[in-house]
């Protein structure tokens, strides 16, 4: 399943295609959404927000389209009039004069009023989004030490969207390697330096992944690019200590770690 950085990049692509442009055609597959089709014609998308792995497409008439891709949903951007060759089932079409965005295969789709937006069960449940620029390491540290989360092993906590929205398995793996901890550690057992390092890594690594993953750095001395240090690298030497990276299963997900420097 895509994690927060991939969802945010998808939102960026949708915004770049249709933000601020009048909608010329709107289509929803689900009967309960059909009545909104005519209400959205002539309106425009003001912005696309991410809340962890959910997308909120906000319209100029104050309605918001909530969508969660789960495992199979995918958004695509096409030139208006183009019909992609795909076996996927179309769920949503938002068309402007030059670009159209299409949502395929997703089943968790709703239209929300401003009032419903504040009471939606999933949105009520998720924690702060790791890509929210207003989220600070100090707030993350407070959450780590809160009674709700301080006694939970990181193996499960870092996959729990109620803790921080947008984290997923590859981020869990890379964050714990970065700070030299294992999935069995708990926040209550960390010293001040470990806690501070973890709070920063929980924000820095997702943000670096969002900003640079998949890019090629032609200027070797300019900034840092995200790359996997341990994820999917079992059997290879750890670049930090030379130990051999291992693979196991934690919280029903593949987990990669270095026994030499994560303890």
Curated annotation (Swiss-Prot):
SMART domains for this protein: Fapy_DNA_glyco (SM00898), H2TH (SM01232)
Which residues are the active-site ones? Answer: 2 (schiff-base intermediate with dna), 3 (proton donor), 53 (proton donor), 253 (proton donor)
Q: Which UniProt keywords apply?
A: DNA damage, DNA repair, DNA-binding, Glycosidase, Hydrolase, Lyase, Metal-binding, Multifunctional enzyme, Zinc, Zinc-finger
Task: Report what the protein is called.
Answer: Endonuclease 8
- Cross-referenced InterPro entries: DNA_glyclase/AP_lyase_DNA-bd, DNA_glyclase_Znf_dom_DNA_BS, EcNei-like_N, Endonuclease-VIII, FPG_cat, MutM-like_N-ter, Ribosomal_uS13-like_H2TH, Znf_DNA_glyclase/AP_lyase
Q: What does this protein do?
A: Involved in base excision repair of DNA damaged by oxidation or by mutagenic agents. Acts as a DNA glycosylase that recognizes and removes damaged bases. Has a preference for oxidized pyrimidines, such as thymine glycol, 5,6-dihydrouracil and 5,6-dihydrothymine. Has AP (apurinic/apyrimidinic) lyase activity and introduces nicks in the DNA strand. Cleaves the DNA backbone by beta-delta elimination to generate a single-strand break at the site of the removed base with both 3'- and 5'-phosphates.
| Swiss-Prot/TrEMBL cofactor(s) | Zn(2+)
Spell out the HAMAP family in the cross-references. Endonuclease_8
Q: Which reaction does it catalyse?
A: 2'-deoxyribonucleotide-(2'-deoxyribose 5'-phosphate)-2'-deoxyribonucleotide-DNA = a 3'-end 2'-deoxyribonucleotide-(2,3-dehydro-2,3-deoxyribose 5'-phosphate)-DNA + a 5'-end 5'-phospho-2'-deoxyribonucleoside-DNA + H(+)
A Gene Ontology annotation in the biological process aspect, one of them, is: base-excision repair
Task: Give the protein family.
Answer: Belongs to the FPG family.
EC number(s) on record? 3.2.2.-, 4.2.99.18
Q: Which organism is it from?
A: Escherichia coli O127:H6 (strain E2348/69 / EPEC)
Name of the encoding gene: nei
Pfam families with a match to the protein in the record? Fapy_DNA_glyco, H2TH, zf-FPG_IleRS
Annotated PANTHER family:
ENDONUCLEASE 8
Q: Name one GO molecular function term.
A: oxidized pyrimidine nucleobase lesion DNA N-glycosylase activity
What are the residue ranges of zinc fingers typed FPG-type? 229-263
Q: Where is the signal peptide?
A: none
The record, for SUPFAM superfamilies, names: Glucocorticoid receptor-like (DNA-binding domain), N-terminal domain of MutM-like DNA repair proteins, S13-like H2TH domain
Which residue pairs form cystines in this protein?
none
Give the residues the record marks as binding DNA.
Answer: 70, 125, 169
PROSITE patterns membership = FPG_CAT (PS51068), ZF_FPG_1 (PS01242), ZF_FPG_2 (PS51066)
Superkingdom is Bacteria
């Amino acid at each position: 399943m895509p994690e927060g950085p991939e969802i945010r990049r998808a939102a960026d692509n949708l915004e770049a295609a249709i933000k601020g442009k009048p909608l010329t055609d709107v289509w929803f597959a689900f009967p309960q959404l059909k009545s909104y089709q005519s209400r959205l014609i002539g309106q425009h998308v003001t912005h696309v927000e991410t809340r962890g792995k959910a997308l909120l497409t906000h319209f100029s008439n104050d309605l918001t389209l909530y969508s969660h891709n789960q495992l199979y949903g995918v958004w695509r951007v096409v030139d208006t009039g183009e019909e992609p060759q795909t076996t996927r089932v179309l769920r949503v079409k938002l068309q402007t004069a030059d670009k159209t965005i299409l949502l395929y295969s997703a089943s968790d789709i709703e239209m929300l009023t401003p009032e419903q937006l504040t009471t939606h069960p999933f949105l009520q449940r998720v924690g702060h989004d790791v890509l929210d620029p207003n989220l600070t390491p100090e707030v993350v540290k407070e959450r780590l030490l809160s009674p709700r989360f301080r006694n939970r092993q990181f193996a499960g906590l870092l996959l729990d969207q109620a803790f921080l929205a947008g984290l997923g398995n590859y981020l869990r793996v890379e964050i714990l390697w970065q700070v030299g901890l294992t999935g069995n550690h708990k926040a209550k057992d960390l010293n001040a330096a470990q806690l501070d390092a973890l709070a920063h890594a929980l924000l820095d690594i997702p943000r670096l992944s969002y900003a640079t993953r998949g890019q090629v750095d032609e200027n070797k001395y300019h900034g840092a690019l995200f790359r996997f240090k341990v994820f999917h690298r079992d059997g290879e030497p750890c670049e930090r200590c030379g130990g051999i990276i291992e693979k196991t299963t934690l919280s029903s997900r593949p987990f990669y770690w270095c026994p030499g420097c994560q303890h």
